[in-house]
Amino acid sequence: GDFLKLLGNGKEFGLKHINYTYQEGEGGIAEALRLAEFFASGEKICVVLGDNIIEKNIRKAVEHFRRQKKGAKILLKEVPDPQRFGVAELKGDRIARIEEKPGKPKSRYAVVGIYFFDQEVFNVIKTLKPSGRGELEITDVNNRYIEKRLMTWDILEGWWTDAGTFKSLIRANQLVAKTGANNL
């Protein structure tokens, strides 16, 4: 219910529409994305993780991806604690690899849980093997696009936090109270 109230049909964020699905149990983000194949209708899609809270909207990134002929796009944000996130290793203007929660991060750029994919993402997911956690990992999907040099990226403007820990949930509440969220 709250997702529907907050996000509506997606038009306010520059999207054509938003569809919702429900994942029973834990299977990984890529498994959850696989559930969306039936309503993606061969079109490009945007995936936003439910614990992301951002200051600015993603309209600019949506427009950049809309003009991209094929492949994927992720949003990055420089963070003080990159070991908590998937981290992008940058080589010039491209991403060389994404490493999930590295002990020694190769950059301070966390992968924000906002992803854009072309219709090939579902074929990529079908080739994945479950990780050691028994899940289909979105990092593996992103690394496949990187290997094919079909991944682009933008820096997310404004602040970003996840609400995945009690500490980050408190921080999210403070940030939203101070500046609001999803501002134009």
Predicted feature locations:
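Structural beta-sheet core signal
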Residues: 47-48, 72-75, 153
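Catalytic-core segments of class I nucleotidyltransferases/pyrophosphorylases
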Residues: 62, 66, 94-184
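Conserved catalytic core of nucleotide-sugar-dependent glycosyltransferases
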Residues: 84-86, 90-96
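A short acidic, often aromatic-flanked loop/helix-cap motif at beta-alpha or helix-coil junctions
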Residues: 25-29, 81-82, 104-105, 160-162
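Conserved donor-nucleotide/metal-binding helix-loop-beta segment in metal-dependent transferases, i.e.
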Residues: 56-84
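Conserved N-terminal catalytic core of the sugar/cofactor nucleotidyltransferase
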Residues: 1-49, 53, 58-60, 67, ...
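Glycine-rich beta-alpha junction loops
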Residues: 52-54, 78-81, 102, 158-159
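Short, conserved catalytic or adaptor-binding loops enriched in Gly and charged residues
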Residues: 9-15, 89-90, 144-146
